[in-house]
Regions:
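Histidine-/acidic-rich catalytic cores in large beta-rich domains
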Residues: 1-181
Length: 181
């Protein structure tokens, strides 16, 4: 593809191969999520002027797209008509860092969403209403001891098929996997 201009990527931070053989890309510094064909034609994009630093994008089973708008500390779910159908701000509690730069989110099989909330030093799982149902790490307090994290970058539940790794047969998800930056 091109190396400069409107069709060039600027720090693509994630890429997901879709069932239709297209690729969904979080084009971080162009502030957009795009779906491209194998010959680099853009067939869908979300580039609302309100986006700032798109860190991650993932297509959901219902064809909506989960987007991490890191610069605005939010997780968005966008339908194919580019309507926001859900959003969650990771800087909305009193102890939150004002700019926590969430870096990754994945929709779990049970409908909840796991979020690596990088500078808030935590991984959270939220339900469909935005309620936190699980948290590991102390909000905005880095560390290396029990219940402490230092800039978690990625998180997913082992055995929960989120498009990253299919679970083994008859596996019950019981553990949370974390990786730091």
């Amino acid at each position: 593809g091109p190396t400069s201009g409107p069709d060039a990527l600027n720090n693509p931070n994630s890429a997901e191969l879709l069932p239709n053989d297209n690729v969904l890309i979080a084009d971080e510094n162009n502030n957009r999520a795009i779906e491209i064909t194998r010959d680099s034609n853009i067939v869908w994009q979300y580039n609302d002027t309100g986006l700032q630093t798109v860190a991650f994008a993932s297509r959901l089973p219902d064809n909506n797209t989960l987007i991490v708008d890191s610069g605005h500390s939010r997780i968005l779910e966008i339908n194919m008509q580019n309507d926001v159908v859900f959003q969650f701000f990771t800087n909305s509690t009193s102890k939150s860092n004002p700019s926590p730069l969430p870096s990754n989110a994945a929709r779990l099989a049970n409908g909840e969403t796991i979020i690596a909330d990088q500078i808030n030093e935590r991984v959270i799982i939220i339900d469909s209403k935005g309620n936190t149902v699980f948290q590991y790490g102390r909000t905005n307090l880095a560390g290396v001891g029990p219940n402490e994290l230092n800039w978690p970058y990625t998180a997913f539940v082992i055995g929960d098929y989120t498009g990253q790794t299919p679970p083994p047969p008859k596996f019950e998800p019981t553990s949370v996997m974390l990786s730091g930056g």
